[in-house]
């Protein structure tokens, strides 16, 4: 089934006909869950439609500065347009660049960094090179993404990611940062976790563990999911 070419939230609108990766639950979860308390500078890596950057802009105080990075030229232009049409056009700056190159060249450090990185390993080719680029882990691993984020992170900053469950568990063992929050995402009550929301820091502290169920046993959105995302979804 074809996904919608546009998506309207309570305070902003997303056009996505030029983006390989459309608005999805993963991005909405991350944008709503990431801890941005006391953050002044925020960065979204691989911004796609600009969804997470816009969610962070909605959630953060007016004085905050948000940067977003997107490699694909079509997605970059559409994200830029989505941002310009939003209430936070002066709050968000977007860059068309590879995240590894951006991490090497950028002189600024950030208090909060978010990323919803590609997660399907290369197998059957996607219908377009654009979607291939957006969806598959081709040349950059999840560890590459985390390492790039670490280079851009303030000493007391936090990195927030969403990943498939097994990949998220594997990344925790490989990286040199401390996992300080972990939320298991369960699509439907009674099922096993499919995703992990993760927060990393340079500072060691006890990891806060939780879980979130999206649909209850009656196939209705759970109270916890609606509570987390109610500032964004029109029907909550």
UniProtKB/Swiss-Prot annotation:
Main location: cytoplasm
Catalyzed reactions: adenosine(37) in tRNA1(Val) + S-adenosyl-L-methionine = N(6)-methyladenosine(37) in tRNA1(Val) + S-adenosyl-L-homocysteine + H(+)
EC number: 2.1.1.223
Regions annotated as coiled coil: none
Signal peptide range in chain numbering: none
Keywords: Cytoplasm, Methyltransferase, S-adenosyl-L-methionine, Transferase, tRNA processing
Disulfide links within the chain: none
Gene Ontology terms: biological process: methylation; tRNA processing
Keyword set includes NADP: no
InterPro entries: SAM-dependent_MTases_sf (IPR029063), Small_mtfrase_dom (IPR007848), tRNA_Adenine-N(6)_MTase (IPR050210), tRNA_adenine-N6_MeTrfase (IPR022882)
GO cellular component terms, A-Z: cytoplasm
GO MF annotation terms: tRNA (adenine-N6)-methyltransferase activity
CDD domains: AdoMet_MTases
Alphabetized Gene3D superfamilies for the sequence: Vaccinia Virus protein VP39
Subcellular location: Cytoplasm
Function noted in UniProt: Specifically methylates the adenine in position 37 of tRNA(1)(Val) (anticodon cmo5UAC).
Family: Belongs to the methyltransferase superfamily. tRNA (adenine-N(6)-)-methyltransferase family.
Protein name: tRNA1(Val) (adenine(37)-N6)-methyltransferase
